[in-house]
Regions:
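Hydrophobic/aromatic-enriched cytosolic interaction surfaces used to assemble or bind macromolecules
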Residues: 1-240
Length: 240
């Protein structure tokens, strides 16, 4: 565990995908006692696929249940609302009740966040200084998150299930067309495993001019990578 300000400790653990997510989490806490230490701040960062963004203006108490039913195609047990004040929006994502309750009992000060939140805030900050629209695509496993900003305004965000390059090409070009982006002046940044990103860039260059590749490791803002004394960040991942 880091004891010096600015130090960073990271541990990756392989898990048995045949076991339930809750049992896997219990095993991790039993095998790694530092997870249960008292911390000044605890962040649980999830990449839960069930998410959406709603404007702050319509996220009111009397409308929440209706929003949840409309947002999630299948019922979710717990809905977490993460404010994104810079975007004047709220990021909603669903969680399993058993995992949520286990974390609440084990780490009562834990704060849930979605991996997409940090990305959106970083892209929003960039777009405030940009003259043209910019689309971002992040490919991990069999999903692709796509977002587009135009001078500080979020134009689009969604997650797609993808199996191959053809799927990625289809969704990227479809969204590009629907948003009426300019193939000469507007930009696309791809983040994926290097071989995927550069192969996809080569194919897309037939249609778009400004295509960039950014390593996934550099996506997250500095405050997501920097560890401070008394802080714990846990990032569960889902294998598909």
């Amino acid at each position: 565990i880091p004891s010096d300000e600015g130090s960073f400790f990271c541990e990756e653990t392989e898990v048995d995908v045949t076991r339930s997510p809750l049992q896997t989490l219990r095993d991790l806490f039993r095998e790694h006692p530092f997870l249960s230490y008292p911390y000044a701040a605890v962040r649980i960062i999830t990449s839960e696929p069930n998410y959406t963004i709603v404007p702050e203006a319509i996220y009111e108490d009397e409308a929440k249940e209706r929003l949840y039913r409309f947002t999630f195609a299948t019922p979710v047990e717990i809905v977490v609302a993460q404010p994104l004040r810079e975007l004047e929006s709220v990021l909603l994502f669903g969680l399993r009740r058993d995992m949520h309750d286990f974390i609440a009992q084990t780490l009562p000060t834990a704060h849930w966040e979605h991996t997409l939140a940090s990305l959106l805030l970083g892209w929003h900050e960039r777009s405030l200084r940009a003259l043209h629209a910019h689309m971002y695509a992040v490919v991990q496993d069999r999903t692709m998150d796509v977002a587009c900003f135009d001078r500080g305004t979020l134009q689009f965000v969604n997650r797609f299930e993808v199996e191959n390059h053809d799927d990625m090409m289809y969704y990227l070009l479809y969204v590009w067309k629907q948003l009426e982006l300019d193939q000469r002046n507007d930009a696309l940044t791809l983040s994926a495993v290097a071989s995927v990103a550069f192969d996809l860039k080569e194919q897309l260059q037939t249609y778009l001019q400004d295509i960039r590749v950014e390593a996934i490791q550099t996506l997250y803002r500095a405050d997501d990578r920097a560890a401070t004394v008394g802080r714990l960040t846990v990032t569960p991942t889902t294998n598909t």
